[in-house]
Amino acid sequence: MARALLIVLDSVGIGGAPDADRYGDAGSDTVGHIAEACAAGRGDRPGLRAGPLRLPNLAALGLGLACEGATGRVPPGLAPGEPLRALWGHAVETAAGKDTPSGHWEIAGVPVRAPWGHFPDTHPAFPAELTAALIARAGLPGILGDRHASGTAIIDALGAEHVRTGRPICYTSADSVFQIAAHEEAFGLEQLYETCRIARAVCDPYRVGRVIARPFLGSEVDGFRRTSRRKDFSVAPPDGTLLDGLEAAGRAIVSVGKIGDIFAHRATGREIKPAGNAACLDAALDAFAELPEGGFVFLNLVDFDTEHGHRRDVPGYAAELEAFDARIPEIHAVLRPGDLCVITADHGNDPTWTGTEHTREQVPVLAFGPGLATGAIGRRETFADIGASVAAHLGLPPLGAGRAWW
């Protein structure tokens, strides 16, 4: 019986979606603009990387051709060699968003139909009733922030005051999110998590997709830095996902990275949450090597987004892509005849773009495995085609959305 490995390269978009102008993102292109910047010498950083973007293994899977399908051009350095080793195409999101839950849920067969709630870019950003309820239920002396902000910038600005006052830093963004940053030692990690659990309940009437705990350490003198103990408190998908179908069929499921958080820990099987892309990929490959027939490993690699996309860090993003590319041979090595690996993304986060937010983009779809077909699968009109294709490959009943490319 076949097995499947689904890898989401968080924010690795390949060109503005057809409706990107509605989001102020027309012309955005995460992979394409990184490749162009590197070709022009703007992706160099001493001690990290230099020169053109080098992704030979992803190019051999059809990434450059997927980019061409999305934008009409192959990014510099991504022209494929022969023979190509995968099915390649690009997918368009049907959900009205450019956030992590919307992208992942649609990949898993459940497009978000009702719009998420968002907070205005004002100060204060949160309704007074919401803030009052959180303060009362969590026993807080108050909150700091209460506005749209970059997570690293607001910690730098308010970290010292937070440590002095005990008030957590609450902020949001263009996504449907309520984020709480607090010092792991001065405030306490468990208290931060409990505050987020309370915030999750307080935010439910506002249709907020995620409450995120953003722990940090450091001091006013030495500076503050985020830690790896972030935790997301998401609402559950409204309908049955690919994961639910796998669970109902009694299949082995392993969720690596923040997958468990994204799906509210429903039907996520064994959860593994290491820190960093390299450790997450290690864990996924180890789990897949031991996976029984019919099993499924679902992996999110978040560092592209959090460490480089939001920070508009072209050299860092390029280096992260190259590091992943170098490990593609390890992925091939764990695949047995009949196994399937799909590499895709959930949205864009163009590090050359204005601001610090996600970008509304199309995503690559690269599907491969020993003995599987190769060639173009064209434009997929919903991310749900990915989940539908994985379900078909694993012999599951059809999902509620999406059309398999098999």
From Swiss-Prot:
Keywords: Cytoplasm, Isomerase, Manganese, Metal-binding. Its EC number is 5.4.2.7. It is found in: Cytoplasm. One of its GO terms (biological process) is metabolic compound salvage. One of its GO terms (cellular component) is cytosol. Its main location: cytoplasm. Mn(2+) 1 binds at D10, D346, H347. Mn(2+) 2 binds at D305, H310, H358. It catalyses: 2-deoxy-alpha-D-ribose 1-phosphate = 2-deoxy-D-ribose 5-phosphate; alpha-D-ribose 1-phosphate = D-ribose 5-phosphate. It comes from Methylorubrum populi (strain ATCC BAA-705 / NCIMB 13946 / BJ001) (Methylobacterium populi). Its cofactor is Mn(2+). One of its GO terms (molecular function) is phosphopentomutase activity. The keyword NAD does not apply. Isomerase that catalyzes the conversion of deoxy-ribose 1-phosphate (dRib-1-P) and ribose 1-phosphate (Rib-1-P) to deoxy-ribose 5-phosphate (dRib-5-P) and ribose 5-phosphate (Rib-5-P), respectively. The keyword S-adenosyl-L-methionine does not apply. This is Phosphopentomutase.
